[in-house]
């Protein structure tokens, strides 16, 4: 099981892990329990951050960034598809941003300041198609202004590792699986 590679990656990071996931399908298919067991076996403190929706919102970004900063998170682990990965990367650069991250990164398209702490991100993919696990991009939506903006950041924002296992996609509806290929 490729999820066991998590045991090799986790020792490289501190104790506190922000566990990012979507609507709960990983709880139904057993992936959540496996990930939590591995995190606990490696002595990690888990900070739950579930409920990431497709096209994550700026409000959720603010919530996740606050959570990461207050918990002094050492690693953000996204378990899900492209939206979870995008959200995790956006949180990683926003938690210690000295300005409003929506305005700085998405309206002004500024890059991450050299002295801004970026929290490392790891991804466990449960869906195919976006490539978010291997780039520095992050798309965030602002429902109030009706804007959906993507920003590609430098290589400092790339996930540090990605774990892919085709069996994680077996429970996806056919239309969702097909959408990942096109």
Predicted regions and their residues:
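Conserved active-site and cofactor/substrate-binding residues in soluble primary-metabolism enzymes
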Residues: 5, 26, 30, 34, ...
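Local beta-strand N-terminus motif with an aromatic residue
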Residues: 14-17, 73, 159
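Conserved beta-strand elements of the Class I
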Residues: 18-19, 75-77, 122
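Residue-level signal for short, function-critical loop segments
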Residues: 23-24, 127
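N-terminal small/polar loop signature for handling phosphorylated ligands or for N-terminal nucleophile
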Residues: 27-101
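A glycine/threonine-rich phosphate-anchoring loop and its flanking beta-alpha core
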Residues: 97-182
């Amino acid at each position: 099981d490729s999820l066991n590679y998590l045991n090799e990656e986790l020792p490289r990071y501190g104790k506190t892990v922000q566990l990012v996931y979507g609507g709960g399908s990983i709880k139904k298919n057993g992936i959540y329990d496996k990930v939590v067991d591995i995190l606990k076996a490696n002595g990690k403190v888990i900070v739950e951050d579930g409920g990431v929706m497709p096209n994550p919102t700026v409000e959720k970004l603010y919530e996740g960034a606050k959570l990461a900063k207050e918990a002094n998170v050492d690693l953000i682990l996204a378990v899900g598809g492209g939206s979870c990965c995008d959200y995790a990367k956006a949180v990683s650069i926003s938690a210690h941003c000295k300005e409003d991250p929506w305005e700085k990164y998405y309206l002004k398209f500024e890059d991450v300041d050299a002295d801004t702490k970026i929290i490392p991100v790891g991804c466990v993919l449960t869906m195919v198609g976006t490539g978010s696990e291997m780039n520095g991009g992050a798309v965030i939506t602002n429902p109030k202004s009706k804007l959906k903006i993507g920003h590609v950041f430098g290589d400092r924002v790339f996930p540090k590792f990605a774990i892919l296992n085709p069996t994680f996609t077996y429970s996806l509806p056919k239309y969702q699986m097909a959408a990942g290929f096109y």
